[in-house]
Amino acid sequence: MFPKLSESFYLRENVQLISKELLGKVLVTYIDGKYTAGIITETEAYQAPEDKASHAFNNRRTTRTEVFYNKGGIGYVYLCYGIHHLFNVVTNNENIPHAILIRSVEPLEGVDIMMQRRNKKKLDKTLTAGPGALSQALGITRLHNKIPLSANTVWIEDRNIPVESIVSTTRVGIDYAQEYKDKPWRYYIAGNKWISRG
């Protein structure tokens, strides 16, 4: 067994640093008796209340965004375009709405299960490259919203996988975010093929 990331990992203030440090960590799910895992290869940081790209911009509080205001170390899953379940990690202390979108993972364990869930015949990067794809492959849905990452359903492990170089660039699909659309708060492992098109 590899250690899960501790609560203190998520409770730190610097969401950009945490986003970078999640690269190379392993996102694991045990759902419906099926175990899957993938190396996190791509993340995006969201730093509300000032971040105009965040669902919690300007301390917006709705039924959907309330999860942001919990203490870090839980999952935030929302539906995009009514189709894709997107998995985020809530960070920082209570009432500070920071979150990190997990955009891509490299399949590691339970690949056959991932391919079955994604209805794939051939293994290629479309299996888990992209936030909707990775959630489907790992079995993550809205049912896992607010799930504690200390539990045994969805969690993140440190397996001491080295990450030599990280690329920082702009986030995807946030043209509405004015000056925040140009923040280099998307991170990915340089040279890794399991990255979304972005």
From Swiss-Prot:
Family assignment from sequence similarity: Belongs to the DNA glycosylase MPG family.
UniProt enzyme class: hydrolase
Keyword list, A-Z: DNA damage, DNA repair, Hydrolase
Pfam families linked: Pur_DNA_glyco
Any one GO molecular-function label of the UniProt entry: DNA binding
SUPFAM superfamilies to which the protein is assigned, alphabetical: FMT C-terminal domain-like
E.C. designation(s): 3.2.2.-
UniProt name for this protein: Putative 3-methyladenine DNA glycosylase
GO biological process, one term: base-excision repair
Signal is among the record's keywords: no
Organism annotation: Cytophaga hutchinsonii (strain ATCC 33406 / DSM 1761 / CIP 103989 / NBRC 15051 / NCIMB 9469 / D465)
PANTHER family cross-referenced by the UniProt entry: DNA-3-METHYLADENINE GLYCOSYLASE
